[in-house]
A protein has these predicted regions:
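Short, surface-exposed beta-strand segments enriched in small/polar/acidic residues
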Residues: 2-15
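Glycine- and acidic-residue-enriched helix-capping/strand-helix junction motifs
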Residues: 12-27
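Active-site-proximal helix/loop segments of hydrolytic enzymes
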Residues: 23-188
Length: 188
């Protein structure tokens, strides 16, 4: 399994005046990795420290590891008023069945959290006919999980006080996908 902690180094990602997306998502990625490894899944991370890794290298890491799937975590700051945005999943515009299954399994597990879910979407929030680089170039099932608005205290709980629960639910969704896809021996 390949887990992508986005941004890193001088690329901070979103910033709400207090928190950096790069830091929050590395922490979540580490927690998801630990959950998966506890279940016997081999995990490769695109970054494990606060370093910059370009998108080409991220894809190379996942593809070279022969990972069964790729999941990348992100945050948003679309609404500075703090209105909750909730969680969304993004897959390739062609809606490949394996990516749709992966994203759906994760979103189903996250259904129990106290934020809204906007389901599995294709493309990007700004352009439904354009793909995120990772979804466009991944050779395996892939999805981007957007974990809410950084200005929303409700959404922020997902990656602060509730991070362990969020990581467990995401890992459970990934495990469900891996089992359904035939990776029951805990590999990849």
């Amino acid at each position: 399994m390949c887990i992508d902690a986005p941004h890193g180094g001088s690329d901070t990602g979103q910033y709400d005046g207090t928190n950096y997306e790069k830091t929050q998502m590395l922490s979540l990625a580490d927690s998801v990795k630990n959950e998966l490894e506890s279940a016997g899944v081999t995990v490769v991370m695109t970054r494990t420290t606060d370093t910059s890794v370009d998108y080409t290298k991220r894809i190379e890491i996942c593809n070279n590891a022969k990972a069964a799937a790729l999941v990348s975590f992100h945050r948003d700051i679309t609404d500075k008023s703090g209105s909750s945005k909730g969680i969304s999943a993004w897959i390739h515009t062609s809606s490949p069945s394996n990516s749709k299954s992966l994203a759906s399994d994760i979103m189903e597990e996250l259904n129990g959290v106290d934020v809204s879910l906007s389901g599995v979407n294709t493309g990007t929030p700004d352009n439904k006919s354009k793909d995120y680089y990772l979804n466009q170039h991944s050779k395996v099932a892939s999805c981007i999980i957007e974990l809410g608005n950084m200005y929303s205290s409700k959404d922020n709980k997902l990656v602060t006080t509730d991070i362990d629960n969020t990581a467990k639910l995401i890992a459970d969704g990934i495990m469900k996908y891996l089992e359904q896809a035939g990776y029951t021996n805990g590999s990849n």
